[in-house]
Every structure is written in C-alpha cells, then in structure tokens.
Amino acid sequence: MAVLDYVLGEERSRLKRYQSHLEEDAAGLPKGSISIKIKSNHPYAYLTFREGGRVISKYIGHAESPAVSELSVKIGDRRRIVKELQAVKAELRRIERMLRV
C-alpha cells in the first residue's frame, strides 16, 4: 500500500504544478467572446465579457481586421486551457478521495 500511496502522492503534486501552470496561462489570455455588430452596412467586432455583474462590450475594430482574428485565436486558446483545467481539477479530486480511503 505504501507504493500506491507514493505514486498517488507524486501524481497529486504533478497535477497541482500543472494546475498552477494552466491558471497562469489562462490569466494572460482574454476571456469573453467576439460579437459582430453592423452599423451603416459595415461589420464591427466587439469583445464581450463580464466584469463584476455587468456585461462589457469593448470595441476591437473592423470585423475583417487581423486584430480580430488574432483575438479569436487567443480566446479559443483560453477556452481550451479552461477545459483542461477543469479536467485536472476533477482528477485531483479523484486522487484526493483515493488517498483518504
């Protein structure tokens, strides 16, 4: 049983390091989504996100600009990281339960 406890402890510490790494990565990326609004037959992009209890729309630029596509990639990266972070947290809870038994 000592070997199993050791392996689970090592996996727990590895997952905690990975969790902090993912949290740092997610903190550096924008959250929210891009919404397109049409004014005078011209599409404009806005970054829409929540701050506190309010919904904020921040102007990015023309919908076809490179800044919009770059921001879209960053938002996609953040969503992927957050999904991975949820999986890591679930695995940590599972390991914690195994160590308690």
Predicted regions and their residues:
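A positively charged, amphipathic N-terminal helix/segment that binds anionic biomolecules
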Residues: 1-101
